[in-house]
């Protein structure tokens, strides 16, 4: 049989068209495919087809991103207002309720309080899963062993946070919590190869400045109380006591000591949890369920060992005249923790991470103001200035992290294009 020889004449190839698309090459490819030695052409065709599929997938992904951006821009205001308000209300409510619970006269059973809150939180999450509102992993012993160190760190975080709230005003507590962000950022630099941008560093200076202003205002108020012989805060119970019962140094230092420990514990908790999440693959509700469930026995054991379970201690911590209301507030605070987790996830899902960061930064202002409104914290130039500077530092930090995320995303996109 005579072999097929393609014609050497062909139409003019348009400028920019690959020679692969010419008539001669296509005919040659057909000939190679029909001959025993045409395997190379088949491989070439397969490679080209795979490249086309990859390009189509990248185009679809890019179209999806652009569509999501357009939907987010065109999203009605009423759609985003509700999750933002829910997150803000949950944060304020949780802080105010916890401050109310631990501010009772001579309240010393903090571990028992936290155990009750964790139990209520687990019950609410389990009930929400049963009725189909949320979903998370079932109990697994291997997951529990891997996550137990994280839960132990969480116990330290919530205990030191409660003690800080017991001795510090809400504005001072809220402002000093910003220092945790600095510790976490430099922890990521050391252990995860992160970096701090100049704008992020500027926000850190503002955070430190707001903390110094808040501490100066708080110490000035305490010194003025001491000089006037007015009641001050007892470092053991957190209650107001006469001047003669307490020393000046204890008054000023104990709250800041608890706050410093809380910042260290919070940073360690976040950094260690980041490592463990990679091992366990936990989602938000998984970590919340295991955190609270595993912390219950730890809190209960510490309560039995450290705290006084005598009848006199119970009547002092849970006075009979307000016992029902106090226990209801404790249970409510446990349920509020679930509400915070849900509203946070809702806000991120509907509004995006950027909006959530800005809302979280601005939300420090009403949280700090709630202490002035509900607990009579002093309104003076120092407190107001510290709150405003702290709010600005949070906004600058949110903008810095957003810009950093955009730069990293563009680098990843360029890296993907170069590989393709």
From Swiss-Prot:
Any one Pfam family match given in the protein's UniProt record, by short name: UAA
Localization annotation: Golgi apparatus membrane; Cytoplasmic vesicle membrane; Endoplasmic reticulum membrane
Molecular functions (GO terms): antiporter activity; GDP-mannose transmembrane transporter activity
Segments on the Cytoplasmic face: 1-76, 128-145, 195-200, 273-293, 345-355, 400-420
Keyword ATP-binding belongs to the record: no
Keywords: Cytoplasmic vesicle, Endoplasmic reticulum, Golgi apparatus, Membrane, Sugar transport, Transmembrane, Transmembrane helix, Transport
TM annotation in the entry: 77-97, 107-127, 146-168, 172-194, 201-223, 252-272, 294-314, 324-344, 356-376, 379-399
Topology feature Lumenal, residues: 98-106, 169-171, 224-251, 315-323, 377-378
Any one GO BP annotation for this protein: GDP-mannose transmembrane transport
One GO location term (cellular component): endoplasmic reticulum membrane
Signal sequence residues: none
UniProt feature, compositional bias: Polar residues: 1-11
Record's bilayer topology term: Multi-pass membrane protein
Major localization listed first in the record, in broad terms: Golgi
Region (Disordered): 1-21
Record family assignment: Belongs to the TPT transporter family. SLC35D subfamily.
Record's function text: Involved in the import of GDP-mannose from the cytoplasm into the Golgi lumen.
Subunit comment: Homooligomer.
Protein name, as recorded: GDP-mannose transporter 2
Species assigned in the record: Cryptococcus neoformans var. neoformans serotype D (strain JEC21 / ATCC MYA-565) (Filobasidiella neoformans)
Gene designation: GMT2
